[in-house]
Amino acid sequence: MQTVNIHEAKTHLSRLVEEAAKGNVFIIAKAGKPMVKVLPLS
């Protein structure tokens, strides 16, 4: 499972959404602390 920092997530949100839609799960971290898990709905 990939972890991205919040700045990278804001910069590349469209790409991350596309990756999640393909089934890739990842974590968004702030200051090195995991905050949320992003995963596809289906």
Regions found by a protein language model. Give the residues of each.
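Bateman/CBS regulatory modules and CBS-like beta-alpha motifs in cytosolic regions of diverse proteins
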Residues: 1-16
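Generic detector of low-complexity/intrinsically disordered segments
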Residues: 15-18, 41
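Short, charge-rich, low-complexity interaction segments located
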Residues: 25-42
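N-terminal cationic amphipathic segment used for targeting or macromolecule association
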Residues: 7, 18, 27-29
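Short, small/polar residue-rich loop motifs at catalytic or cofactor-binding pockets
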Residues: 20-22
